[in-house]
């Protein structure tokens, strides 16, 4: 027997025995797999600092009171009652969790409700970084991660390493959409995990903030389950309709003019090689590489944004103190002056909201300052009051800054001010805060509740805004950026970031560019995981493939360099291994960036949309080190709608050979490739793309009066 919600087309069935989801059907198609329970709670024992997990199966008494489901009778806390109000609004099933009679020694820390499972064979969209379609072994065996202390890259936390607050699972026609309808963008874990019967659990764990300290608590927003026809892009359209009215997407400052010229981002370290070490390399003094940069600019026919890694005076990745640059301020400023006079830009990496107490790779230490100034009182604390930091702990020993504490904000802004005053155009100071992630803090004497929650999102948004205003006050309004794509509530404030490829987990499904391209154009990034993920020698065109995919997503192009001046596979590649073949990469990038500048109304200012022209082409086998190969189209494509309503679809042949492709279109179009323009009628067409080339399909458009 079951409780049924919904209508004839879209139906939810719950177990009468324990309230678990048994079935979700859409137009007669089953979208879900049976779940064993409805919820998981993580309670915080505030006297001891321990966690206590509760599963729905531990509450033997279950009943329904109209729209409200209630669980109670736990043997350790008989009065403790968990509730969920379920409604159907014609489009979504809405779940509103609540707690009553919470035991006095506990605070509500995390709530996962409902527990939603899907069959293993479904394609699963996971919002890790830009978004990905998760693959094995992660799909079947991913561990159950939770937001917590200290911060690390394992759990997918929103807003942060999770860029949006929805997941999706779909088959050949229909799919399931699972999201938090939370306009405050509070902290959540956006995860998956193995479930019973060859199924996967789509997991949204919500934090409780100050309200979690009460004995009665209701989550202030709904979790929603909807259905769609199509794939991950159609799921994105649901989220886009919700997000476009969010006032957080409004930007209150002008973007710098140099973004209009689409500089190619050239990334390299001035210390170490593919490994992080403190020894200077051949990129120092800074001016030494200027001749090579001039050559690259000429070969690409483009201005450059030179983005330096491991430049900080105290050694690579030793926050929060960076200035002056390693190699000397005089050399650095001379280099900046040369770049600016040649029409280029300069950017720097930072290392986020972290504090280094001691380096593990050389003799740098701040232990004396830390002790004498009593800085520990400003640091983020764990559930037992401990201080720690796990991120980059192989490089440094340290702690995390609590960004509600004025001293921590001041030290971040002080570094931004120094960098801005010296003419830098872009500062990725939130590297290691993936997507702008703010770290959990349980301190009871800081300027926030002693539980994770929406205060973290608000504090990070305020920090980003304060850093930006600090830079603007110097007369140099440099851009602030983060590692990976900026998560949704920070997109407007950080429109230019170092996108990271989620290839280690699955095939990229770039929801961030799809949803937010008109607000933010990220760049391909330093691709630090490429070498450890891709068998580069066995997939020699893989860098060209990555450039092509970046271009059709509307991103700025970027390369990393070795100190030989060669373009590399990525920032962490082995410099003793052969570099990529150079000329094909440069030829392709020049073609793509010329198109990017010519069609900036699409590729810089446009809204990404689902391609209307269907392409049939061959497949490229991308050979990977730790999982099965990915097979990706030999002709990547992406479609955009310009602000004036005109539409275009871009395509790329990234290999050094002609590539046949068949196009199916419901309307006529004009194909432009280089200097060639050819008109095609609606229907099916066959053509051959030249080697290392890009093209655009243009559709007739009547402008509105």
Language model features: what each stretch is:
Residues 306-380, 459-482:
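Acidic/aromatic-lined carbohydrate-recognition and catalytic surfaces
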Residues 400-493, 507:
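Active-site neighborhood of glycoside hydrolase catalytic domains
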Residues 264-287, 314-329, 393-411, 445-459, ...:
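The substrate-binding groove and active-site-proximal loops of carbohydrate-active enzymes
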Residues 205, 216-222, 456-675:
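Active-site-proximal substrate-binding groove within the catalytic cores of carbohydrate-active enzymes
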Residues 681-705:
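C-terminal beta-strand-rich structural cap/linker in extracellular carbohydrate-active enzymes
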Residues 281-296, 408-420, 543:
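Short, acidic/polar
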Residues 331, 337, 345-419, 504-519:
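Active-site-adjacent "subsite" loops/lids of carbohydrate-active enzymes
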Residues 4-305, 338, 342-345, 426, ...:
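Carbohydrate-recognition beta-sandwich/jelly-roll modules
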């Amino acid at each position: 027997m079951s409780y049924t919600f919904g209508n004839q087309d879209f139906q939810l069935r719950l177990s009468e025995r324990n309230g678990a989801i048994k079935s979700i059907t859409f137009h007669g198609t089953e979208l879900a797999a049976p779940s064993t329970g409805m919820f998981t709670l993580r309670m915080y024992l505030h006297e001891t600092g321990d966690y206590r997990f509760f599963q729905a199966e531990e509450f033997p008494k279950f009943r329904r009171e109209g729209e409200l489901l209630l669980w109670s009778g736990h043997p350790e806390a008989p009065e403790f009652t968990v509730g969920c109000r379920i409604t159907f609004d014609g489009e979504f099933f809405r779940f509103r969790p609540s707690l009553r009679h919470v035991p006095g020694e506990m605070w509500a820390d995390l709530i996962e409700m409902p527990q939603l499972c899907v069959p293993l064979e479904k394609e699963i969209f996971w919002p890790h970084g830009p978004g990905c379609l998760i693959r094995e072994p992660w799909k079947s065996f991913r561990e159950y991660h939770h937001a917590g202390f200290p911060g690390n890259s394992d759990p997918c936390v929103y807003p942060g390493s999770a860029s949006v607050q929805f997941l999706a699972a779909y088959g050949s026609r229909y799919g399931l959409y699972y999201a938090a309808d939370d306009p405050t963008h509070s902290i959540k874990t956006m995860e998956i995990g193995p479930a019973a019967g060859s199924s996967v659990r789509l997991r949204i764990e919500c934090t409780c903030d100050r309200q979690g300290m009460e004995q009665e608590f209701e989550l202030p927003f709904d979790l929603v389950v909807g259905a769609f026809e199509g794939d991950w892009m159609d799921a994105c359209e649901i989220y886009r309709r919700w997000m476009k009215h969010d006032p957080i997407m409004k930007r209150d400052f002008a973007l710098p003019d140099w973004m209009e010229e689409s500089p190619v981002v050239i990334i390299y370290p001035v210390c170490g090689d593919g490994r992080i070490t403190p020894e200077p390399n051949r990129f120092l003094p800074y001016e030494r590489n200027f001749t090579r940069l001039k050559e690259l600019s000429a070969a690409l026919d483009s201005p450059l944004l030179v983005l330096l890694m491991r430049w900080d005076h105290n050694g690579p990745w030793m926050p929060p103190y960076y200035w002056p640059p390693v190699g000397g301020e005089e050399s650095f400023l001379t280099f900046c002056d040369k770049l600016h006079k040649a029409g280029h830009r300069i950017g720097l990496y930072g290392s986020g909201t972290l504090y280094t107490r001691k380096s593990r790779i050389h003799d740098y230490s701040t232990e004396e300052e830390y002790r004498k100034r009593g800085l520990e009182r400003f640091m983020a604390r764990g559930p037992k009051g401990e201080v720690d930091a796990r991120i980059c702990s192989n490089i440094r020993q340290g702690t995390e800054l609590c960004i509600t504490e004025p001293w921590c904000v001041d030290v971040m802004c002080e570094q931004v001010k120094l960098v801005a005053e010296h003419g830098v155009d872009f500062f990725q100071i939130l590297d290691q805060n993936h997507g702008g992630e703010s770290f959990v803090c349980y301190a009871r004497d800081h300027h926030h509740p002693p539980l994770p929650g929406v205060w973290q999102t608000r504090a990070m948004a305020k920090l980003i805004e304060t850093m930006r205003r600090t830079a603007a006050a110097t007369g140099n309004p440099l851009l602030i950026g983060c590692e990976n794509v900026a998560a949704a509530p920070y997109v407007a404030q950080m429109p230019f970031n170092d996108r990271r490829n989620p290839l280690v987990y699955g095939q990229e499904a770039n929801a961030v560019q799809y949803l937010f391209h008109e607000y933010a154009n990220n760049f391909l990034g330093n691709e630090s995981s490429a070498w450890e993920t891709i068998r580069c020698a066995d997939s020699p065109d893989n860098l060209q493939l990555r450039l092509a995919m970046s271009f059709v997503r509307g991103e700025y192009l970027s390369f990393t360099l070795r100190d030989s001046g060669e373009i590399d596979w990525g920032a962490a590649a082995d410099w003793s291994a052969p570099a990529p073949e150079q000329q094909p990469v440069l030829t392709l990038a020049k073609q793509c960036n010329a198109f990017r500048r010519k069609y900036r109304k699409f590729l810089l200012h446009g809204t990404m949309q689902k391609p209307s022209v269907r392409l049939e082409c061959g497949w490229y086998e991308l050979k990977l080190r730790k999982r099965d190969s990915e097979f990706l189209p030999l002709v990547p494509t992406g479609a955009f709608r310009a602000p004036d309503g005109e539409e275009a679809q871009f395509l790329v042949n990234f290999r050094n050979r002609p590539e046949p492709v068949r196009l199916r279109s419901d309307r006529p179009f004009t194909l432009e490739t280089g200097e060639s323009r050819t008109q095609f009628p609606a229907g099916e067409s066959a053509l051959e793309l030249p080697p290392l080339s890009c093209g655009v399909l243009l559709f007739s458009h009547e402008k509105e009066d």
